Amino acid sequence: MEHTYQYAWVIPLLPLPVIMSMGFGLFFIPTATRNLRRIWAFPSVLFLSIAMVFSIQLSIQQINGSSIYQYLWSWTVNNDFSLEFGYLIDPLTSIMLILITTVGILVLIYSDGYMSHDEGYLRFFVYISFFTTSMLGLVTSSNLIQIYFFWELVGMCSYLLIGFWFTRPIAASACQKAFVTNRVGDFGLLLGILGFFWITGSLEFRDLFKIANNWIPNNGINSLLTTLCAFLLFLGAVAKSAQFPLHVWLPDAMEGPTPISALIHAATMVAAGIFLLARLFPLFISLPLIMTLISLVGTITLFLGATLAIAQRDIKRSLAYSTMSQLGYMMLALGIGSYQAALFHLITHAYSKALLFLGSGSIIHSMEPLVGYSPEKSQNMVLMGGLRKYIPITRTTFLWGTLSLCGIPPLACFWSKDEILSNSWLYSPFFGIIASFTAGLTAFYMFRIYLLTFDGYLRVHFQNYSTTKEGYLYSISLWGKKIPKRVNRDFILSTTKNGVAFFSQKRPKMKGNTRNRIGYFSTSFGAKNTFAYPHEMGNTMLFPLLILLLFTLFIGFIGISFDNGAMDNGIAELTLLSKWLTPSINLTQESSNSSINSYEFLTNAISSVSLAIFGLFIAYILYGSPYSFFQNLDLINSFYKESPKKYFFFLDQVKKKIYSWSYNRGYMDIFYTRVFTLGIRRLTELTEFFDKGIIDGITNGVGLVSFCIGEEIKYVGGGRISSYLFFFLCYVSVFLFFFIS
């Protein structure tokens, strides 16, 4: 055991030899390195696999072991201050190491196929390997200054990968937006680190936690200053994990390659903020005000992310808002003291979201031969549909990932989300109501993504779609065609200016009167001569999907735990995660509310699953196949015919406002642009005017006046008698004028 711990410092450094080798190869033998570029994927996967084996061994030893601090070397600034660099191995570190390495390996394998035709193949592998190294260094750090160093490296790598296709202006703008937004949080994190060093005199976690466990108002520590420093640390996590109000960078980060989106959302950048709060949990739990703030921010974020996801057309952007919402659940769990539930959801969500993002990459790859290599088209769900018969393996894996995120048992996210919902109800009904409602909303927008992508018929060959208008009906009408206010409901068909039928002229007949029917959300297409259809990707891209599917199916079972009451009911007690997920420094004990008996578990599970099924049901009604079972029963049409027109008009207006608000990202970007961007520009213009007009004006004016006076004096003293006589008479005249007056 000690032998393994002795070499644990090697884990973050294992990907570095591959990075250095690729760099030397590009520098000394660039032609050969580029021609043989795909061979570099093997050593990248190999070295990260070695790191994974080390991580698994450490995790097994940590189940019944204790935390290990190991210092490698010390940088002494003076006799009173020194920085000690080392590593900390505890259950939290072990879990994060496994998470990063497993997801990282699968993303690397997937990237070999996804990026095979890209000119930046080698550059991508250098960036992603360094990204993994930075995150591994972050989770093994033993003090705050070491965390900050790797924290900045993670931010730098995300900047490089989000703007990987930097020749595209949108990608360049997106990476700048992510970088600037995270600067706010990183600055707060740095101030918080310096503040706690000033308060406690140490940057080591164990010293901070010992002091935090003992501080009370009588021990001389300023509680207001301590709370402020803790808030600044929390601000860093807010920015990195895309929490409200610093969440605006996350959807734009989808401009990077899809594999890096999977890695960012599953195991690296956005997980760093949750990891920081989990690492400092014994510190935060001693500050009730900060814990309340964490839970409030998490609650706002989980609801906001879900509402913003319901109207997006871009498949990756929809998944990005889903990540934002799920991170809000983790933040809420940490805020209410449910440490185990938060990290459990971090694990289950990581594998499910990696599966969904890699599946979306397969979808995008299959659409590119049809619509071109523009993300505005290849990622647009408006142009998809009916892909289940073209990419069946991707469809199956994507469906299981969707159901997992919806909270359907026995998939991974069901167990963790149900635990968070139960604890939130026990902590506060307010948090419980919002978290439960958002759980149903999650099922709605996730199943919407699935239906728009795989259900119905392929819509890419439709000629009259729009990609410019931003009406709310994008999320209702799959075609992106903004419907005018007055719609003739006697007809299902709609025509364009060119006279081309918007729907197929050969539509199946429906029983009953078609008059006063509402427009359906997808349709059946007639045969159309086409030469290209989506197709399944190669085995290199499918293999990671299948492995992640296994994780999604079975990883949730490690977190099933019941108390002794459950044992009496004959239910086996599985406490692997309970032994594993404990605070890194065991100074606090988790609330007993986190352990529930079988009756409470079944009650909470039934309610959460009912909400999820209701969300799936609503999504299927709105976005399912056009002639589904419910529509053939005239369920929607009978509701419309029996409802008052005023009520239906009001409902339509409310729906329009909601979808418009959601599609425009809650107008947060517009608000930030007008308040901060334009406000700063106006402030700079005012500063420029003050600097050049007033400050420079006074300085230049004094110089100009001095110059003019000097010129006049020079002119007077030029040696001309006429000038002397003229000024003599002028002075005499002025003197006489004042003397006489």
From Swiss-Prot:
Entry keyword Transcription regulation: no
EC number: 7.1.1.-
GO molecular function (one): quinone binding
Keyword terms of this UniProt record: Chloroplast, Membrane, NAD, NADP, Plastid, Plastoquinone, Quinone, Thylakoid, Translocase, Transmembrane, Transmembrane helix, Transport
GO biological process terms on file: ATP synthesis coupled electron transport; electron transport coupled proton transport
Parts of the chain that traverse the membrane: 9-29, 39-59, 89-109, 125-145, 147-167, 185-205, 219-239, 258-278, 280-300, 327-347, 354-374, 396-416, 425-445, 542-562, 605-625, 721-741
Subcellular localization(s) per the UniProt record: Plastid, Chloroplast thylakoid membrane
Highest taxon above the source species: Eukaryota
Keyword Coiled coil part of the UniProt annotation: no
Protein topology in the membrane: Multi-pass membrane protein
Gene3D superfamilies, per database record: 1.20.5.2700
Pfam families from the UniProt entry: Proton_antipo_C, Proton_antipo_M, Proton_antipo_N
Enzymatic reactions: a plastoquinone + NADH + (n+1) H(+)(in) = a plastoquinol + NAD(+) + n H(+)(out); a plastoquinone + NADPH + (n+1) H(+)(in) = a plastoquinol + NADP(+) + n H(+)(out)
First-tier enzyme category under EC: translocase
InterPro entries for this protein: NADH_UbQ_OxRdtase_chlpt_su5_C, NADHpl_OxRdtase_5_subgr, ND/Mrp_TM, NU5C-like, Proton_antipo_N
GO cellular component: chloroplast thylakoid membrane
Function: NDH shuttles electrons from NAD(P)H:plastoquinone, via FMN and iron-sulfur (Fe-S) centers, to quinones in the photosynthetic chain and possibly in a chloroplast respiratory chain. The immediate electron acceptor for the enzyme in this species is believed to be plastoquinone. Couples the redox reaction to proton translocation, and thus conserves the redox energy in a proton gradient.
Similarity comment: family membership: Belongs to the complex I subunit 5 family.
Assembly notes: NDH is composed of at least 16 different subunits, 5 of which are encoded in the nucleus.
Protein name (Swiss-Prot/TrEMBL): NAD(P)H-quinone oxidoreductase subunit 5, chloroplastic
Species in which this protein is naturally found: Lolium perenne
